C-alpha cells in the first residue's frame, strides 16, 4: 500500500487499539485480512464500525484497511470507529464538526474498575448479616 493518497488514524477503546488506513475506492472494509462481515459476527459491532462513514456519507467512496488487536468484540468495534473518525478528519478537516457532534472524536476513557480486597468484585460486597 502506498502512502501517496491514503490517510491514517489510530483508535483506542478499553484494551483494544486499531490502525485505520483510508484511501479512495468503492467501500471495501478489510479488518485483519478479513471482510467486515466475516470478522464481526454481531450486527451491532458492524453498525458501530460503519457509523462515522454513514454520518459523512462516504460509505461507497472510500476503501478501509484496518488492523486491530487486543480486547473483545465491543472494544475492537469502538477502537475501529475511533480510528476511522481520526482518519476521516485527516482526510477532510471540514468533517470534524459533524463527527464531534455525533460524539465520535472523543476517546471513550472508561476502563474496567479494579477488584478491591475484601469485596467479591470491584463494588460487589459480601452479603451483610445483621445477626
Swiss-Prot record:
Transmembrane segments: none
One GO cellular component term noted in the UniProt record for this chain: cytosolic small ribosomal subunit
Pfam family, one: Ribosomal_S9
UniProt-listed GO biological process terms: translation
Gene Ontology molecular function: any one: RNA binding
Keyword terms, alphabetized: Ribonucleoprotein, Ribosomal protein
NCBIfam families: PRK00132.1 (NF001099)
Similarity remark: Belongs to the universal ribosomal protein uS9 family.
UniProt-recorded name of the protein: Small ribosomal subunit protein uS9
Organism: Glaesserella parasuis serovar 5 (strain SH0165) (Haemophilus parasuis)
